[in-house]
Amino acid sequence: MNNFKFIIINFIFYTMCFMQVAQPYPPLNLVSVPTAGTLPRGSFTFESLITKNGGIIPKLCVGFTDNFSFGVSYGIQSLIGNNKPFVNKTTPEVQIKYRVFDESEKMPAIVYGLDTQGRGIYRDSIISFQDTVMINRYDQKAWGLYMVVSKNWNLLGNLGLHIGFNKSLGENDDGDNDFNFFFGFDKELNRSFSLLLEYDAAFNDNFFKVNNQLNELTFGRGKGYL
């Protein structure tokens, strides 16, 4: 098992290093918040997001046209560490982006998208007060359906502003299916480094029908994610 972990981690690491040579601009995402950036036709990216408790979410995305991209991801928990790795789901999650308006000098770019990949562990149910509560959700919900508007300016290097709304699709068993709001920006420092900042308001995660912390999980706190 340790050899398997070593092989997977090294594959992800070296692939990420290789892909950074031709990273598209503007970025497809900030840290987790989507932008209106899409992949050029015929190009692809492979990236991984490291999550808490040794989890990794590798994602492959392909640009089918300049305005349409499709990706798949697969959450693996406890890949880093001594615990036995396990997957969130037996099937991969999907990411779809379609840019309906290209950015111009005066107007921002607008993208409609779908992202079913949440953050953290996916749980079908939890135990609360000796009762089984069905939740069917990630620790941090997936974006689901979303719309994002992006505008870039050349201000001593690129400055990008990104604002969007989203609605979860399949993670509403907690009784909270509100629309959500997010925003972020990226500031190019030089050709190799950029400053990224994002905020997810988590309006769709500020209520839970059992109304407690549930095994120290963060469900229902509604404080947002910075």
Feature locations, PLM:
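Outer-membrane pore/translocation modules
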Residues: 22-24, 74-177
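Outer-membrane beta-barrel strand-turn architecture
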Residues: 40, 52, 64-68, 76, ...
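Transmembrane beta-strands of outer-membrane beta-barrel proteins
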Residues: 28-29, 47-49, 61, 69-75, ...
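Residues that define the transmembrane beta-barrel architecture of outer-membrane proteins
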Residues: 40, 52-58, 87-94, 139-145, ...
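Outer-membrane beta-barrel biogenesis signature
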Residues: 18-47
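Outer-membrane beta-barrel architecture
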Residues: 39-45, 57, 69, 105-111, ...
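Residues on the lipid-exposed face of transmembrane beta-strands in outer-membrane beta-barrel proteins
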Residues: 46, 58-62, 72, 94-98, ...
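Outer membrane beta-barrel transmembrane domains
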Residues: 184-188, 192-226
